[in-house]
Amino acid sequence: MFIPILFLTLTLASADVMTLMESEPQPSTTESRPSMPPINSGKPSVTEKPGVELNPGETVKVKAEQFNTVNPVELKLEKRIPPGRVGSNCIDCAISNLPKAMFSVKVPKLNINFEVSDFPSSRLIFATLAQRVKSIPFIESLSFPSDIQRMQLRALGDVEVLIFIPKFGWKQILKLSDVVSGFDIPKIPSIAPKVESCVGDCLNS
């Protein structure tokens, strides 16, 4: 009697265990993979531009962009009258008051040295000086000077010009840029000759 009851108990317990195992959810075998970014082919995206369709007889004009061109400025060295100061007035005053005056013109830093004795005037002196300056090899090679070369020209404009009359001890000291144009930056002007009358203390110079 005891053995059949024990056997029945074991059978019922085994059936409960099997039922419990079947009811448990099985883990999913599908592995989750991280999302991958889209593969870029390395080619830039090209936006297609709409084409232009022309009807018979129609035309399209295309104008290319023009770049601003800089026209070179030609170097012109000419006599500057009147100069930056009253130099020309004093020279013409000395000519009118000192008989048979012979002028000596020197620019030591440029090795320029000449005399004007026949019909002297400030115009003649400055024109001759301008010709001597233009004959300097460095100046003569500058047809269309660059910005750096114009800076060098400006430095030359600061050298002293000695104009004097040895017989009477009269002298006048000017800058080269006072009597010769062409040393200005950035524009190189051309100044027309103009001599004014004698003024100021030139008679006593």
Swiss-Prot record:
Coiled coil: none annotated. GO terms for biological process: symbiont-mediated suppression of host innate immune response. The keyword Ribonucleoprotein does not apply. GO terms for cellular component: host cell nucleus. It is found in: Host nucleus. It comes from the Viruses. Keywords: Host nucleus, Host-virus interaction, Inhibition of host innate immune response by virus, Suppressor of RNA silencing, Viral immunoevasion. Residues 23-52 are annotated as: Disordered. Acts as a suppressor of RNA-mediated gene silencing, also known as post-transcriptional gene silencing (PTGS), a mechanism of plant viral defense that limits the accumulation of viral RNAs. May directly interfere with the mobile silencing signal. Belongs to the cucumovirus/ilarvirus protein 2b family. This is Suppressor of silencing 2b. It comes from Tobacco streak virus (strain WC) (TSV).
